[in-house]
Swiss-Prot record:
Catalytic reactions on record: 2 oxidized [2Fe-2S]-[ferredoxin] + pyruvate + CoA = 2 reduced [2Fe-2S]-[ferredoxin] + acetyl-CoA + CO2 + H(+)
Subunit structure: Heterotetramer of one alpha, one beta, one delta and one gamma chain.
Binding site for [4Fe-4S] cluster: 16, 19, 44, 208
This protein's UniProt keywords: 4Fe-4S, Iron, Iron-sulfur, Metal-binding, Oxidoreductase
Top enzyme category: oxidoreductase
Compositionally biased spans, kind Basic and acidic residues: 149-159
EC number(s) recorded for this UniProt protein: 1.2.7.1
Disordered as annotated region, ranges: 137-159
Domain of life: Archaea
Entry-linked NCBIfam families: PRK11865.1
Note accompanying the cofactor annotation: Binds 1 [4Fe-4S] cluster per subunit.
Gene that this sequence comes from: porB
Origin organism lineage: Archaea, Methanobacteriati, Methanobacteriota, Methanomada group, Methanobacteria
Protein name: Pyruvate synthase subunit PorB
Length: 288
């Protein structure tokens, strides 16, 4: 795939060095183009790209509350439809907290109503903007400020909420998982979402150097390691048909992924083995 050179997210924003969210937004907007309206919930992306009076966005952009990105995007879509404008893409960007927790009700409603919008969840697996608190998307065993490891706790004790399958259960015509570390796979999925008649949901996995604890130069490498170990699986569901879009030639041990991050370094060998067993069971079910 030839990646367009034009940028719709300007450099000079205030993202952390190695920020994965901005990589994802840049790639998505290269596919969607200038005829796009973006809606962004409160979160990392909003804070780093629009410190008043500055903005890094080169397209129309709307900042909304933590919980209602999907609702506002659906309103924008209906307004454009009323004006006879079918040439404008409407995309919502929200983090995992604004998607799996606070914004789930609005997202569910927008998907169920069938609005012609694209919703991209940039998942860094915690509330990174407000202090690295756990979310429903925080993986089992991860240490956060509200699920810390210590004498009484080993970190997050709940499994990661499966948002893509929840969206698929709504009958959404296009649902996909993606990773910033596999840009062509992600951009192809954005293209399919753009061409979908109806709502589309993409769950984008993006390493967070601040919250996960790793070298900022290793963001893309760590994202690849998540996929190569089976900790994050790339797939799409088109009109109910499930397809894995990338299969590692030989899966690496999950321990390689866990050991590369500070948030998992407290885990015992027994706990790591338990995580490996879970990953193995999921991969076996999907024949990866």
């Amino acid at each position: 795939m030839k990646i367009p050179e034009e940028e719709f997210l300007a450099p000079g924003h205030r993202g952390c060095a190695g920020c994965g969210a901005t990589v994802g937004v840049r790639l998505a907007l290269k596919v969607l183009g200038k005829n796009t309206v973006a809606v962004s919930s409160t979160g990392c992306l909003e804070v780093i790209t629009t410190p008043y009076p500055e903005t890094a966005w080169r397209i129309p952009w709307i900042h909304v509350a933590f919980e209602n990105a999907a609702a506002v995007a659906s309103g924008v879509e209906r307004a454009l439809k009323a004006k006879g404008r079918d040439d404008v893409n409407v995309v919502a960007f929200a983090g995992d907290g604004g998607t799996a927790d606070i914004g789930l009700q609005a997202l569910s409603g927008a998907m169920e109503r069938g609005h012609n919008i694209i919703y991209i969840c940039y998942d860094n697996e915690a509330y990174m903007n407000t202090g690295i608190q756990r979310s429903a998307s925080t993986p089992y065993g991860a240490s956060t400020t509200t699920s810390p490891h210590g004498k009484e706790s080993f970190g997050e004790d709940r499994p990661k909420k499966n948002m893509p399958l929840i969206m698929a259960a709504h009958g959404v015509p296009y649902v996909a998982t993606a990773s910033i570390s596999y840009p062509e796979d992600f951009m192809e999925k954005v293209r399919k979402a753009k061409e979908t008649d109806g709502p589309a949901y993409i769950h984008l996995h993006q390493p967070c150097t601040t919250g996960w604890g790793f070298d900022p130069a290793k963001t893309v490498e760590l994202g690849r390691l998540a996929v190569e170990t089976g900790s994050w699986i790339l797939y799409e569901i088109e009109d109910g048909d499930f397809r894995v879009t990338y299969r590692p030639v030989q899966r690496k041990p999950v321990e390689e992924y866990l050991n590369a991050q500070k948030r998992f370094r407290h885990l015992t060998e027994e706990q790591k083995a338990r995580i490996q067993e879970y990953v193995d069971s999921v991969c076996q079910e999907l024949r990866i």
